[in-house]
Amino acid sequence: KPNAGKSSLINKIAGEERVIVSDIAGTTRDSTDTVIENEYGKFVFIDTAGIRKKSKVTEKIEHYSVLRAYMAVDRADVCVIMLDASEGFTEQDSKVAGYAHEQGKACVVAVNKWDLIEKNDKTMQEFRTKLENDFSFMSYVPFVFISAKTGQRINKLYELIKFTYGQNSMRISTGMLNDVLAYATTRVQPPSDKGRRLKIYYITQPSTKPPTFVIFVNRA
């Protein structure tokens, strides 16, 4: 979403005014790459223009911004979905999150401008519960509450980026998968097809990003 703080985050971690930042939504018109190398590893951050509501897409350049945002998702290994804490989950956030999910990308939800929210000891948990409902179609995605302006929890964001990348790239041996499958079938019997019990032969993992599994059964 425009003006959620994506460019401010890039500038904070880069330590320079790498991307134009202003209070005007949509300042970033193009996707720009920033290479960062630190104690967490080497990263290439792709900053994009946010996706606007349809009613606000009045210029051809905005159409290109939407296309470039989706192209950035296609290029990325991990998608950091930046939310504005003062606005919560919006239609535009849903679109980009849904696209990243459909493309099988590792994702992290970063709730920005957390320093501007009035809080008590329950605020974060209440916000997290609401986000879990909003992101019910992506229940596997971790959340982090940050401030791109102050740098609050940026280290945690790095950790989650590395963690989700590792999870999405994970390859599990066929032997381990079949041990798990054998245990599962002792607990729950395979379903029946037209009155005949299905027999599961084995499971394998043909690919990663995202981890994909194929189970071989009779009558399939």
Regions found by a protein language model. Give the residues of each.
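C-terminal-of-GTPase-core extension/linker across diverse P-loop GTPases
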Residues: 1-46, 54-67, 71, 75-82, ...
